[in-house]
Regions:
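Conserved metal-binding segment of the jelly-roll/cupin
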Residues: 109-129, 139, 257-278
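Extended, compositionally biased flexible segments
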Residues: 54, 61-127
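Catalytic core of Fe(II)/2-oxoglutarate
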Residues: 251-265, 270-299
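A short glycine-rich, His/Asp/Glu-containing loop-to-beta-strand
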Residues: 40-74, 166-217
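Intrinsically disordered, low-complexity terminal tails and inter-domain linkers enriched
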Residues: 3-28, 227-233
Length: 334
């Protein structure tokens, strides 16, 4: 078995201006805080390796594996269900005597990807003839569902918010869209200069029909600036992520400069905004899971900021969106 890893993301360096403010005694990740700069949570074959043990919580996991052309990665799913999602490149996923060729995509900024779901208590093999970077989104679970393929054409692409709060959400693993036991996973794309995850919201209490209790991971990729004349090469981008305590017992307090390949752990608290710097589109992959009997994404807006939703009624969606559409059934595999 061969497996190749790098420092995470698309290779952009994490600058020295990265800011991470944490207070209290809340959950800590592999890097000692809630903000994990690219490479700080690498382990073994993974450029990023977040599991319940490392995060100090109960359910959510995220791994990123980078394969050279012809590379292979094998893993056991253990107590978790997983979705294998190409971030760049394509691959073949083998599990449960099933084989799922994934077309993938050139990058997260260039298309919706197909994906493969693999159940708990299974052995999985990922092979990539052309090489690429692949996210493994996971959640501890009880039910054992069948391995299956998720077509890109079946991914609902949602335009959320208005004005400079416009963003695109690829709901590939959302509750009510794709069946899983506990895992919820979506992609969010924010045009440069816009805010997303806004208004700030939380999902850290189990209130049936009102709010879900969900741990969450944000994994970021930031589009570089490409000078028109090619002079000097690509300029790395950045963004910002805010998380604030939501009440007694919530100690998650983060103001982080996030760059390509960074991750932020959110065990609790108000999270948002996620801010994309002008000229640099922002991508983040959200992975969520929790103890609730109902697999649902129910959120509570911050009361001081919830009014912003009413202001969107008179504003258009950012004309830069969508950055792309899901392919038609006929277009897949072309």
């Amino acid at each position: 078995m061969t497996s190749s890893t790098g420092t995470g993301g698309t290779g952009s360096a994490v600058g020295t201006g990265s800011t991470n403010t944490t207070v209290g005694t809340g959950t800590r990740g592999a890097g000692g805080g809630f903000h994990l700069p690219a490479g700080s949570a690498a382990a073994g074959p993974y450029a990023l390796d977040i599991d319940p043990r490392r995060a100090g919580w109960g359910y959510s996991s995220l791994r990123v594996v980078e394969l050279e052309p012809g590379g292979t990665h094998e893993f056991a799913t253990g107590e978790s269900e997983w979705i294998v999602l190409p971030l760049s490149g394509g691959c073949t996923v083998e599990a449960e005597d099933r084989t799922f060729p994934l077309r993938g995509r050139p990058s997260v900024f260039e298309g919706v990807s197909d994906f493969a779901y693999v159940p708990r208590d299974a052995d999985v093999r990922i092979t990539s003839s052309g090489g690429g970077r692949f996210a493994l989104t996971g959640a501890r679970c009880t039910r054992r569902l069948p391995a299956r393929y998720g077509p890109a054409s079946g991914v609902p692409v949602e335009l959320r918010g208005r004005g400079n709060c416009s963003r695109q959400v690829n709901n590939f693993g959302a509750a009510g869209v794709f069946e899983a036991d506990q895992l919820i996973a979506v992609e969010v794309l924010t045009p440069g200069g816009n805010w997303s995850s806004y208004p700030p919201h939380k999902h850290d209490e189990d209130r049936p029909g009102v709010e879900s209790e969900l741990e969450e991971i944000y994994y970021f990729e930031i589009a570089p600036h490409l000078p028109a004349d090619g002079d000097g090469g690509a300029v790395p981008g950045l963004g910002y992520q805010r998380v604030s305590p939501s009440g007694p017992g919530s100690a998650t307090d983060v103001l982080a400069e996030v760059r390509d390949g960074d991750a932020v752990l959110i065990p609790d608290g108000w999270h948002g905004p996620s801010i994309a710097a002008p000229g640099h589109d922002m991508y983040y992959l959200n992975v969520m899971a929790g103890p609730g009997l109902e697999r649902a994404w129910l959120i509570c807006d911050h009361p001081e900021h919830a009014w912003i939703r009413g202001s969107w009624e008179e504003q258009p969606v950012d004309p830069r969106l969508p950055l792309y559409h899901a392919p038609t059934v006929e277009g897949e595999g072309e």
